[in-house]
């Protein structure tokens, strides 16, 4: 078996791996091998390229690892879905395309952890801007010439978007024109990773398209990383599988693990890096007993609050097969129409209590009543709010089941394990009902479909959450940055106690961010790419940003309709 040599080997061509591959190969003297277990991002496949088709990749296994959790003890012992992207682009190939960076205080909070002082919001903002091309042009908060195409919401797409935002404001919450700008808190339009031609802006399209022709980058698809190879405590390469064939690759400088919050700890554990007791159970030779690998797993849990729509303005007709050819043809020929949007064009972030320092609840508004994965569509005109808490105190874990790289690991998010989780979800349902009963929605709002108007008491709300809440597909934090006993990597993604090995993806977040994770993951990779290259970090951007400082979470005096008593 021959062993080829590269300066860097990247395991995983997802939101982070494609950034690293592109930035590292800007130096023509550096060679990079990019390994991806999935296939290409076929540009002719509408399932991944059409924004409106976002549910399709989650329904099969061509583009989705289709993980399932162990029975979740606080969720009626349900085995819950944990979809992760497979193919060039990783989860940016199958996600909802919502471009949300997180709250400024997420990063300021990270920076209070020992050793993470350079992860403040103002340190991270230059890398958000570097990655982005926003369709309305750059400003103090946004970039204009980055690899990721970001499309802003346009007025008049669907009257339900504006009505739902107006309802949030009428309920006493702020209005914000930019969820990624000065103030995340409030309701407003939502940016999306969609190209000007109406195509999904995955990192394969944005980053790899500019790098894949470089002679110093080799991309190998259908290549499943089996183990990281070590020479003592130094990572020296990777052994991987292509079908039934095994190949080895040697890394002169570093191995970069970018396989995501599920597969990165799985690969480390399979390679002998992780909790020693777990490795001994599978007779894996221990390279380093690192207890935090696979621990601290976090996610966002969400539920769908659904209503009948009294006027025929929802997307319900677009779900019918006889209307879809016309929608698809317009999208294919012109890049316009219903097919060119993910239809998450409005949303918001709120605090449910005045003492919450920054938003603890996120909303995605959708002008149809359907599950995120395309299942359980309501057979009528409807609309819904996806709502969930942002910083659950519950923690889970990813644990290896088998030395076989094709075997899925044991995953337990441990959703809703803490009392605060239940309080926040009850608050979220009641806040959503207050928003939905505002005058802006009077002409559209019919009966409440889910959870249903009769679901009112704490016990009834808890039963609904336990039986119906689903993942928002934001696993993270399972190889966290930091310097405490459970930290896995340092502030530059270098694995503690080893040489030549980094983890760079959403797994290294110490605490999950407020919102969707694609944009923060790209930022993390951009920031660490400069560290790997030995470059000076981009200068901090000195801009103001909103801090609540104990301000009222909701201005009840300005609310048009007061909450109902129950």
From Swiss-Prot:
EC main group: oxidoreductase
Residues forming the catalytic site: 474
Region (Disordered): 180-203
Positions of FAD binding: 7-36
A Pfam cross-reference name: GMC_oxred_C
An MF annotation (GO) of this entry: betaine-aldehyde dehydrogenase (NAD+) activity
Pathway: Amine and polyamine biosynthesis; betaine biosynthesis via choline pathway; betaine aldehyde from choline (cytochrome c reductase route): step 1/1
The entry's keywords: FAD, Flavoprotein, NAD, Oxidoreductase
Cofactor(s) the protein needs: FAD
UniProt GO BP: glycine betaine biosynthetic process from choline
UniProt-listed Enzyme Commission number(s): 1.1.99.1, 1.2.1.8
Cellular component, GO annotation: membrane
Keyword hit for Flavoprotein: yes
Record field: catalytic activity: choline + A = betaine aldehyde + AH2; betaine aldehyde + NAD(+) + H2O = glycine betaine + NADH + 2 H(+)
Function: Involved in the biosynthesis of the osmoprotectant glycine betaine. Catalyzes the oxidation of choline to betaine aldehyde and betaine aldehyde to glycine betaine at the same rate.
Protein family (similarity comment): Belongs to the GMC oxidoreductase family.
Protein's name in the database: Oxygen-dependent choline dehydrogenase
Origin species: Burkholderia ambifaria (strain MC40-6)
Chain's gene name: betA
């Amino acid at each position: 078996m021959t062993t080829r040599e590269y300066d860097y080997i990247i395991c995983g061509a997802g939101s982070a791996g494609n950034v690293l591959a592109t930035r590292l190969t800007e130096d023509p003297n550096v060679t990079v091998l990019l390994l991806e277990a999935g296939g290409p991002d076929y540009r002719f496949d509408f399932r991944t390229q059409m924004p409106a088709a976002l549910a399709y990749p989650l329904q099969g296994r061509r583009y989705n690892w289709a993980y399932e959790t162990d029975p979740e003890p606080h969720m009626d012992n349900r085995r819950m879905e944990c979809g992760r992207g497979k193919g060039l682009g990783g989860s940016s190939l199958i996600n909802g395309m919502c471009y949300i960076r997180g709250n400024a205080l997420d990063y300021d909070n990270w920076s209070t952890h020992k050793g993470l002082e350079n992860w403040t919001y103002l340190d991270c903002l230059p890398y958000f801007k570097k990655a982005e091309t926003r369709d309305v042009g750059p400003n103090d908060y946004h970039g204009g010439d980055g690899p990721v195409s970001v499309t802003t919401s346009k007025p008049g797409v669907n009257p339900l978007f504006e009505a739902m935002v107006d309802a949030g404001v009428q309920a006493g919450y702020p209005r914000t024109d930019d969820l990624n700008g000065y103030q995340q808190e409030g309701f407003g339009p939502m940016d999306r990773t969609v190209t000007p031609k109406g195509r999904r802006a995955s990192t394969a399209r944005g980053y790899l398209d500019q790098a894949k022709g470089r002679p110093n980058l080799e991309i190998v698809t259908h290549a499943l990383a089996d183990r990281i190879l070590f020479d003592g405590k130094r990572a020296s390469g990777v052994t991987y599988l292509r079908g039934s064939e095994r190949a080895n690759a040697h890394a002169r400088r570093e191995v970069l693990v970018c396989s995501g919050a599920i597969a990165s700890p799985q690969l480390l554990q399979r390679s002998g890096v992780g909790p020693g007791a777990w490795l001994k159970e599978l007779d894996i030779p221990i390279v380093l007993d690192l207890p935090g690998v696979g621990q601290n797993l976090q996610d966002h849990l969400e539920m769908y609050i659904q209503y009948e729509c009294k006027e025929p303005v929802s997307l319900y007709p677009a779900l019918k097969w006889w209307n879809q050819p016309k929608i698809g043809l317009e999208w294919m020929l012109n890049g316009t129409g219903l097919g060119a949007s993910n239809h998450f064009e409005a949303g918001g972030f709120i605090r449910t209590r005045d003492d919450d320092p920054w938003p603890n609840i996120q909303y995605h508004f959708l002008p149809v009543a359907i599950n995120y994965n395309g299942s359980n569509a309501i057979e009528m005109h409807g609309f819904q709010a996806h709502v969930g808490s942002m910083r659950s105190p519950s923690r889970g874990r990813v644990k290896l089941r088998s030395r076989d790289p094709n075997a899925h690991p044991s995953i337990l998010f441990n959703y809703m394990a803490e009392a605060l989780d239940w309080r926040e979800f009850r608050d979220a349902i009641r806040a959503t009902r207050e928003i939905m009963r505002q005058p802006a929605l009077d002409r559209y709002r019919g009966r409440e479909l889910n959870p249903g108007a009769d679901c009112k008491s704490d016990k009834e709300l808890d039963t609904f959450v336990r039986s119906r809440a689903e993942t928002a597909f934001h696993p993270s934090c399972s190889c966290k940055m930091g310097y405490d006993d459970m930290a896995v990597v340092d502030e530059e993604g270098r694995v503690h106690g080893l040489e030549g090995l980094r983890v760079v993806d959403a797994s290294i977040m110490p605490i999950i961010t407020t919102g969707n994770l694609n944009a923060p993951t790209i930022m993390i990779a951009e920031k660490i790419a400069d560290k790997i290259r030995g470059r000076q970090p981009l200068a901090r951007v000195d801009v103001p940003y909103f801090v609540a400082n104990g301000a009222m979470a909701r201005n009840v005096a300005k609310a048009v309709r007061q909450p109902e008593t129950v």
